């Protein structure tokens, strides 16, 4: 790959790798809680603490493919830097959700709601990128250049 291509995706790759490390951390928490309660074997049922860790991890895993899809779509189709920043914010919010879920369930609600908003923002960035592509394709007008012109004046 040439440097320009790598430069266009490096921030997205960094956020993706950080999310992989975070998933490993969550899985380690589940494994640790399972072994604490059940000895050496992994079982899906157990104490309330294990149920909370397992459910929090499962909820994070359920939203993960959607996060990756909108992160990369927004970064490739619209702009890499805001998409990567939103991705980092999502990872911080997901961490807050996970830790909050282990305590009182009401502590996880702000993280959950803000995480949904970040995914919506990334989705809207993706739609804007697709819209801009078709504006250029059909009308020869680049909306992104117009936005840059307006914001710099």
Curated annotation (Swiss-Prot):
Subcellular location: Nucleus membrane; Endoplasmic reticulum membrane
Transmembrane residue ranges: 9-30, 53-77, 81-102, 116-128
One Gene Ontology term from the biological process aspect of the record: leukotriene biosynthetic process
Intramembrane intervals: 108-115
GO molecular function: arachidonate binding; enzyme activator activity; glutathione peroxidase activity; glutathione transferase activity; leukotriene-C4 synthase activity
SUPFAM superfamilies for this protein: MAPEG domain-like
GO cellular component, one term: endoplasmic reticulum
Keyword flag rRNA-binding: no
Topology of the protein relative to the lipid bilayer: Multi-pass membrane protein
Keyword tRNA-binding found: no
Lumenal side: 1-8, 78-80, 129-153
Organism superkingdom: Eukaryota
Cytoplasmic side: 31-52, 103-107
Annotated keywords: Endoplasmic reticulum, Leukotriene biosynthesis, Membrane, Nucleus, Transmembrane, Transmembrane helix
Family affiliation: Belongs to the MAPEG family.
Domain notes: The C-terminal part after residue 140 is mostly disordered.
Subunit record text: Homotrimer. Interacts with LTC4S and ALOX5.
Purpose: Required for leukotriene biosynthesis by ALOX5 (5-lipoxygenase). Anchors ALOX5 to the membrane. Binds arachidonic acid, and could play an essential role in the transfer of arachidonic acid to ALOX5. Binds to MK-886, a compound that blocks the biosynthesis of leukotrienes.
Protein name from the UniProt record: Arachidonate 5-lipoxygenase-activating protein
Biological source species: Macaca mulatta
């Amino acid at each position: 790959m040439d440097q320009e291509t790598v430069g266009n995706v490096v921030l997205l790759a960094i956020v993706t790798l950080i999310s992989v490390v975070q998933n490993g951390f969550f899985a380690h928490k589940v494994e640790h809680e399972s072994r604490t309660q059940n000895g050496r074997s992994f079982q899906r049922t157990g104490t309330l603490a294990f149920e909370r860790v397992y459910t929090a991890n499962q909820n994070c895993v359920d939203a993960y493919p959607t996060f990756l899809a909108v992160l990369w779509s927004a970064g490739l189709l619209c702009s890499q830097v805001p998409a990567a920043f939103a991705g980092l914010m999502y990872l911080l919010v997901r961490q807050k959700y996970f830790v909050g879920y282990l305590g009182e369930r009401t502590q996880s609600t702000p993280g959950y709601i803000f995480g949904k908003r970040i995914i919506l923002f990334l989705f809207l960035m993706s739609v804007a990128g697709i819209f801009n592509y078709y504006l250029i394709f059909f009308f020869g007008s680049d909306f992104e250049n117009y936005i840059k012109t307006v914001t710099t004046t």
